């Protein structure tokens, strides 16, 4: 099925509230506990998960402290722990049921101390200069205006130890309308191939209602502005990307 370009209709100030986003994830724990179903709408989700977990332990082989922002059911933390066990893991999420499921799953893994932080990451009090690895997978697209984005990247930078690594995998948009239109069209065709006729419309509708993604270049510029000395693109395919900043 041919999928045409889909333009966002909902302005940022009319998007889902934090409470509404929390309710959606509270009700969907089982699906997000399974990578095959929870990440069906994400192009190359298994590849990005493997890349980030592999590079996390390669860049920081002696890492002791890990923070997973918007951890969901713990998929990224589990992938990293299985390649480098024994780390202390701090898990942060809006959804208490998600946090409980992540903690439950990590109980079966070789970890150090596991702590959970329930709430909006922007409002959580976390230890500064404490983390060797920070991961944010499919979460930053909920940030809204420029001040929100800049504040969040600055906070993450402050939480990392010198030499620490900040990994992101997420939905991204594009600065040029023509590029965005083509990438969005290709994403729609991918969705139809995965979920059948009409699936792209469902996904596009909740993106329009809930998400405010920014471009990969915008986010990497923010990393530099926050102070990260090295930044690298790990992977990009259509509207999804994985990238890293080193403090």
What are these regions (language model features)?
Residues 126-134:
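A short acidic, Gly/Pro-enriched loop at the edge of an enzyme's catalytic core
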Residues 169-226:
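C-terminal alpha-helical "lid/dimerization" subdomain adjacent to the S-adenosyl-L-methionine
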Residues 136-140, 168:
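A short beta-strand submotif of the Rossmann-like class I SAM-dependent methyltransferase core
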Residues 2-60:
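Conserved class I S-adenosyl-L-methionine
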Residues 150-162:
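A short glycine-rich, Lys/Arg-flanked "PGG" loop and its adjoining helix->strand segment in the class I
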Residues 141-145:
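A short His-aromatic
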Residues 224-247:
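Core SAM-dependent methyltransferase catalytic element
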Residues 65-123:
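Class I SAM-dependent methyltransferase SAM/SAH-binding core
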